[in-house]
Design a protein with these regions (language model features):
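Bacterial Sec-pathway N-terminal export signals of envelope proteins
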Residues: 3-51, 55, 91, 153, ...
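Acidic, glycine-rich loop-and-beta core segments that form the ion-binding/anion-interacting portion
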Residues: 215-261, 279
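Small/polar, glycine/serine/threonine/aspartate-rich low-complexity segments that form flexible
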Residues: 51-91, 199-209, 253-290, 417-420
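A glycine-/polar-enriched beta->alpha junction
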Residues: 16-26, 33-48, 72-89, 99-106, ...
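Periplasmic alpha-helical coiled-coil/stalk elements that build and connect Gram-negative outer-membrane
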Residues: 9, 107-222, 326-333, 360, ...
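Amphipathic alpha-helical coiled-coil segments
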Residues: 27-42, 104, 108-128, 138, ...
C-alpha cells in the first residue's frame, strides 16, 4: 500500500475543495433542484397533458365497457383563482432554498477556514514546544548537576521536572488536537489526513470592524439564513392565501378525448348506431359550496405561516444578538492580542539581556551573576509567551471570521484569498 506524500495546501485550495466536497452543500443543492421542479410542476398545470392508451381485449355477450383499440385524452387547467398564489409560494420556496444554499456555503467556508487556521496555529505551537522541550531538558540537566553538587535544594530539581512534565503534557495534547484537525480537514476537502500541511503565507489578515457600526442593517440585508427564513414564511403565507381562495372560487378545466372502437367485439350488434371514431371536447366547472375539509386546511396553512414568521423573527433576533456579542468582544480580544504581543516582546528582550550578561557580564559590581539556568528559564519563558501570542491572535481571528459569517460576507472574504 502506497502512502500519500505530504503536500502543502493553501487556505484557498482547502476552502475550494471543501465547497466542492461538502455533503451539506450537496444536500442544499438538491433542495434547490427540488424547488425548481416544484415551481415547474405548479406552473405547468396550465399546459395541456396528453395521454395515449389502449384497451384491446376479448369480450362475449352484452357490452360491459368500451371496445377501445386506442384512445387519446388531453386536459389542462383553464382557471384556478388559487393557482397564482401557489406559483408565488413555489417561487418563494425556491428563493428560500437558494438562500439556504448560500448560507450553507458560508458555514462551510467558516468551518474550513477556522480548522485550517487552527491547524496552522497548532503546528506552530508544536514547533515552539519542541524547542521548549530542549530547553527544559537542558534545565533539568543543570538542576540535577547542582543538586548532586549540593549547591541547590532538591525543590529546584522538582520544579524543573514539573516544568518539563507540563511541556510534555501540553505537547501530547496539541499533537492529539492536530490529528483531529487534520482528520476534519480531510473529511471537508477529500485530501488524505496524513499528508495535510498548511501554508501560513496563504492566510491573509482578517478585516476589522468599526466598533460603533450598526450591524442590524447588515444582518437584515445580507444574512442568508435570516433571509431564507423570511422567504420560507412568505411562501407559506401565499400557500395559505391559495388554500383560502379554494373555498370560494370555481375551478375550470379543459378536457378532450378521442376513442377508436373495435368492430371485432360485435358491439355493433348491440348498439343501434355504432361508429369506430368518437371524439369529445369540453370544459368542466367545479363550484365549491360547502367543504369543511378545505376550511380546516385553510386554518392549518394560516397557522403554519404564522409559525414560520415567528421562527424567522426569532432567528433574526438571535442572529442580531450573536453579532452584537461578537462585535463587543472584538475590542477585548484585540487588546488581549496586543497584551500577548507585548508580553512576547518583553520576554524576547529579557532573553537578549540574559544572553548579553552571560556573554559580557552585567557591568555592575554588586549584581547577582547569572547562570546557564537563568538562560534556559528565559528561553522557556519566551517560547511560552510566543504560544500565548498565537492563542490570542487565533481567538481574535475566529471572532472576526464569525462576525463575517453572521453578516454574510465570509465567502466573499474567501474568494479574495490568493489562489496558490
Amino acid at each position: 500500500m502506497s502512502l500519500a506524500a505530504p503536500a502543502q495546501v493553501s487556505l484557498y485550495t482547502a476552502v475550494d475543495l471543501a465547497l466542492r466536497n461538502s455533503t451539506s452543500v450537496r444536500v442544499a443543492t438538491a433542495d434547490v433542484q427540488k424547488a425548481v421542479a416544484i415551481v415547474n410542476e405548479t406552473r405547468d398545470v396550465y399546459l395541456p397533458s396528453f395521454y395515449v392508451g389502449s384497451g384491446i381485449g376479448y369480450s362475449y355477450g352484452f357490452p360491459v365497457g368500451q371496445p377501445s383499440i386506442w384512445d387519446m385524452t388531453a386536459q389542462s387547467t383553464l382557471f384556478n383563482y388559487s393557482l397564482p398564489d401557489y406559483i408565488r409560494a413555489a417561487r418563494l420556496g425556491l428563493r428560500s432554498t437558494q438562500l439556504t444554499l448560500r448560507d450553507t456555503r458560508q458555514q462551510v467556508v467558516l468551518d474550513t477556514s477556522l480548522n485550517y487556521i487552527l491547524l496552522n496555529k497548532t503546528t506552530d505551537e508544536l514547533a515552539a514546544l519542541d524547542e521548549e522541550a530542549k530547553y527544559s531538558a537542558k534545565l533539568l540537566e543543570i538542576e540535577q548537576q547542582r543538586v548532586d553538587a549540593g549547591v541547590e535544594p532538591r525543590v529546584e530539581l522538582t520544579r524543573a521536572r514539573l516544568t518539563d512534565a507540563r511541556i510534555r503534557l501540553k505537547r501530547l495534547h496539541l499533537a492529539d488536537e492536530a490529528a483531529v484537525y487534520r482528520e476534519t480537514l480531510s473529511h471537508q476537502t477529500g485530501l488524505p489526513a496524513a499528508s495535510f500541511i498548511t501554508d501560513s503565507k496563504s492566510i491573509p489578515a482578517t478585516p476589522e470592524f468599526a466598533s460603533g457600526g450598526d450591524l442590524n442593517l447588515l444582518i437584515a440585508g445580507a444574512n442568508q439564513g435570516v433571509q431564507s427564513a423570511y422567504a420560507a414564511a412568505k411562501s407559506k403565507q401565499y400557500a395559505a392565501f391559495g388554500d383560502n381562495r379554494q373555498q370560494y372560487y370555481p375551478l375550470i378545466t379543459f378536457n378532450a378525448q378521442y376513442n377508436r372502437y373495435a368492430r371485432f367485439n360485435n358491439y355493433d350488434l348491440y348498439y343501434k348506431n355504432f361508429q369506430s371514431n368518437n371524439f369529445g371536447v369540453g370544459v368542466q366547472i367545479t363550484i365549491p359550496l360547502f367543504d369543511m375539509v378545505k376550511r380546516a386546511k385553510t386554518r392549518e396553512s394560516a397557522a403554519d405561516a404564522s409559525r414560520s414568521y415567528a421562527q424567522a423573527d426569532m432567528l433574526r433576533d438571535q442572529t442580531e444578538e450573536q453579532a452584537l456579542r461578537l462585535q463587543k468582544s472584538l475590542a477585548e480580544l484585540s487588546l488581549q492580542a496586543e497584551v500577548a504581543a507585548l508580553q512576547l516582546d518583553l520576554a524576547q528582550s529579557q532573553l537578549e539581556t540574559v544572553l548579553a550578561q552571560l556573554s559580557t557580564g552585567s557591568g555592575q559590581a554588586n549584581a547577582t551573576p547569572l547562570s546557564p539556568r537563568d538562560e534556559q528559564n528565559a528561553r522557556i519563558e519566551e517560547r511560552q509567551r510566543f504560544e500565548d501570542s498565537l492563542d490570542a491572535e487565533y481567538e481574535l481571528t475566529r471572532a472576526r471570521l464569525s462576525l463575517l459569517r453572521t453578516v454574510g460576507s465570509v465567502e466573499d472574504w474567501a474568494k479574495s484569498l490568493p489562489n496558490r
